[in-house]
């Protein structure tokens, strides 16, 4: 609800010492080559995502077990003309591109079997999902861009990153569990007792395919307003009631990023576990 942004800056500080907790926040970035129009939305696209995630892990000097969150930006369509004689794919939707990106990230992290990265699975086989990926798509790029957040052993600093799942858009308990696991205290009123420890909160929230929440119909799939806007507004209220403010990054559509109707939440805390 509050317009703002998070800025990540990598600074070489000779005064920095390893975290007393033994690990601290590290991030890595990577960018793939340009995809051809024929590759976008295909298993080859997913493998390019996986390779780019692995490159970001190398840049951050971490293994898959250290990764807390992978942020993926992936192309929807391409402005590049189709190769002569090639058959261009039918239009790749935002949801389809996010599905490909999520399964590619899951492949790189060992969460999705390579044998199940097939065209028929994308945005269809919802038994498959990554566990630590938030995926975004756009027509303004023709490549895959990755930003990866991890807790690297021996890293300097006092920040750590933590990830958890949400059952649905009303799962306040899931958010409280995330903050508690990060070392924050929950007050008797259900709000954070030490909100100053939380320096960033990121949420990817979704809606079940039938639009129901806990068995009841909702208006989220009505035609007058995009469902993602309903989801973001609902999640803003739920998360804001715990944090005590609305400076929260919230996005919608969790295809292959969580079980259907569920979501992913992450926080960066200072002096946490």
Descriptions of predicted regions:
Residues 1-273:
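Terminal domain-initiation and capping elements
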